[in-house]
């Protein structure tokens, strides 16, 4: 049926005197999409078929050749209305396409698009030959790289998908589809073993080779180059038995650049998305030394001493320094999150968020801002684009951003860091901000000190820069409420407690269910790996304060603050009437014979006598917590 359809479609269009471009415009699709309809490579959906029938003044039966007598006379008046044909209707608004990372797919779906094509102009206007951009996961890196590839690639016809964008009216428009491009995404080059990771790397590069498969036998290429191209391609297959296979894999990207340079007579643009994923996977899988030579070699040969390279851009989470990938590159710029370059190209600005929400008939609110805003790239304040898009689609203020791969690294890092980092981390959790030395110059796994770890936390989007105090010294903050969820998991790991038990305990506390709170608190203490860290009253105080930090959405958390006639341990000021205010006072004894219930009662009396609730309005719960090792008693009123 498809074969008949595309023949009849072409015939009807020509009899009506329309060009393909005119047809595409009238039915609301890209010209390239319509061309695929007539070539038989694509079939329109039902709604598009209806629009085609309206434009060509025919029925679906006629369009599919089910009533041949009409085909030769398109001016005949229809004798009856077919059940398929409907009158023309207003075209639906573009929908959100959540998770689509291919620019062409996004545009051909007529999906809503937050225009980031200024990235193309800024990149092409740059003087640097190699650009490295570090940004968190799900901040639009892959989509932007796909967009750049579509714009530059001389094998594409991209005018339709860039129509109406910023770059369409810019100074670099004439560069569209004028250059050979090698575009590789290492997003999925990760595995549990060295062999599996190397094969994933080969598969990714081989797929780009296959895009240019017709060059294998093209006589416009010198024979030696065709042979070189073929041998590199064969080496990228699983189970290659060539003795020089590894050498060809290491040089495979450069060989592809060389081939394209000879064929098209122009130097190549190299785009490497998520370049650091295989390095991070190999390190977390503890097989890095097995793959080091290939990972280092394939990137080094592509970027250094590659005479066929016009410009390259790489994106990832962090800069890898020790492997010498970037050493010796005199024309390199590294754009971390504190740099001004490309600061508005990744993530949504508030203006873009408001426009998106208005388009979706969703109201902008302070609650949304607190949940998803708070990042700072260069001089630009940005929102998490993934979370905002999900919220616009679902209209539920939830946590959508999951950063699993980085979280595993951070959990391991918390285990090995010393007291200095732990104190800074506790300050961050308790106050929401901390001042620290930050190192952006290399990946954390290359130098596992606290400055490099803070650099990873910033680049991964777990914390953001609030203020640059001096060189390498910053005030950092947790960007928003959504990221507090990540810290809840990390803090549970840091305190060596179960996250779900912590959640149960905190829920019971804010609901005023003190019996349940006491049970969960005792359970947490009993399941701690050791009681050696619980050596005084302050130890319990700090542990509880770290957990109470995750009540910030509903409470203002204060510790050791002057109130009434003294300093309270922890005061929780309710932000909503539905929750009670809470005052927690801690007591400790080494004497196992001392009555803990009496000690907890003493804490309650202290709260009352010192009038710690003097500034609180509404319902207040007093909570006294007495401890001896892992044993506790909780009193309340």
Identify the meaning behind each predicted range:
Residues 1-15:
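A short, Lys/Arg-rich alpha-helix, primarily the initiator
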Residues 99, 115, 153, 157-215:
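P-loop NTPase motor core
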Residues 321-329, 335-391, 424-429:
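Amphipathic alpha-helical segments of the small helical/lid subdomains adjacent to P-loop NTPase cores
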Residues 64-88:
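Short, charged recognition helix plus adjacent turn
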């Amino acid at each position: 049926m498809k074969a008949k359809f595309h023949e009849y479609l072409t015939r009807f269009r020509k009899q009506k005197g329309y060009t393909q471009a005119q047809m595409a415009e009238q039915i609301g699709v890209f010209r390239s999409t319509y061309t695929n309809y007539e070539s038989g490579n694509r079939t329109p959906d039902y709604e598009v078929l209806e629009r085609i029938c309206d434009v060509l003044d025919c029925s679906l039966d006629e369009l599919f050749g089910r009533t041949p007598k009409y085909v030769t006379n398109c001016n005949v008046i229809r004798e009856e209305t077919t059940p398929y044909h409907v009158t023309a209707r207003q075209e639906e608004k573009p929908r959100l396409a959540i998770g689509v990372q291919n620019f062409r797919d996004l545009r051909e779906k007529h999906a809503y698009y937050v225009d980031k094509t200024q990235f193309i102009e800024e990149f092409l206007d740059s003087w640097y030959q190699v650009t490295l951009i570090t940004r968190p996961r799900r901040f639009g890196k892959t989509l932007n790289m796909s967009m750049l590839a579509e714009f530059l690639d001389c094998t594409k016809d991209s005018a339709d998908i860039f129509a109406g964008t910023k770059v369409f009216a810019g100074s670099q428009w004439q560069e569209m589809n004028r250059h050979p491009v090698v575009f590789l995404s290492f997003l999925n080059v990760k595995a549990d073993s060295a062999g599996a990771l190397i094969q994933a790397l080969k598969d990714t590069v081989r797929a780009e080779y296959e895009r240019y498969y017709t060059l294998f036998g093209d006589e416009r290429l010198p024979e030696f180059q065709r042979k070189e191209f073929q041998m590199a391609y064969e080496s990228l297959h699983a189970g290659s038995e060539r003795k020089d296979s590894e050498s060809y894999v290491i040089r495979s990207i450069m060989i592809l650049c060389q081939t394209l340079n000879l064929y098209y007579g122009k130097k190549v643009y190299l785009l490497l998305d998520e370049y650091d994923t295989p390095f991070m996977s190999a390190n977390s899988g503890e097989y890095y030394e097995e793959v080091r030579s290939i990972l280092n070699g394939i990137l080094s040969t592509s970027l250094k001493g590659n005479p066929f390279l016009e410009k390259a851009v790489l994106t990832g989470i962090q800069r890898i320094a020790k492997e010498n990938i970037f050493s010796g590159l005199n024309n390199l710029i590294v754009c971390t999150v504190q740099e001004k370059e490309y600061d508005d190209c990744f993530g949504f600005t508030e203006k873009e968020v408001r426009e998106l929400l208005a388009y979706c008939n969703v109201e902008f609110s302070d609650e949304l801002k607190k949940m998803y805003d708070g990042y700072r790239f260069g001089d630009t304040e940005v929102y998490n684009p993934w979370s905002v898009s999900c919220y616009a689609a679902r209209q539920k203020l939830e946590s959508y951003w999951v950063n699993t791969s980085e979280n595993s690294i951070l959990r391991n890092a918390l285990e090995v860091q010393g007291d200095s980092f732990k104190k800074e981390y506790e300050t961050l959790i308790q106050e929401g901000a901390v001042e620290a030395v930050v190192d952006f110059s290399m990946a954390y796994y290359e130098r596992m000190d606290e400055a490099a770890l803070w650099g990873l936390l910033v680049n991964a989007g777990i914390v953001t820069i609030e203020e640059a105090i001096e060189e390498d010294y910053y005030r950092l903050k947790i960007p928003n409420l959504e990221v507090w969820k990540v810290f809840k998991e990390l803090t549970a790991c840091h305190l060596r407690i179960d996250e779900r038990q912590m959640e149960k305990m905190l829920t019971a506390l804010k609901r005023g269910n003190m019996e349940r709170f006491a049970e969960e608190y005792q359970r947490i203490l009993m399941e701690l790996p050791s009681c050696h860290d619980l050596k005084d009253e302050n130890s319990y105080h700090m542990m509880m304060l770290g957990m109470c930090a995750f009540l910030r959405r509903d409470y203002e958390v204060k510790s050791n603050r002057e109130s009434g006639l003294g300093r309270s341990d922890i005061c929780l000021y309710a932000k909503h009437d539905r929750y009670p205010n809470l005052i927690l006072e801690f007591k400790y004894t080494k004497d196992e014979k001392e009555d803990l219930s009496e000690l907890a009662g003493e804490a309650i009396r202290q709260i009352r006598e010192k009038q710690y609730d003097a500034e609180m309005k509404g319902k207040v719960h007093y909570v006294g917590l007495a401890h001896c090792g892992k044993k506790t008693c909780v009193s309340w009123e």
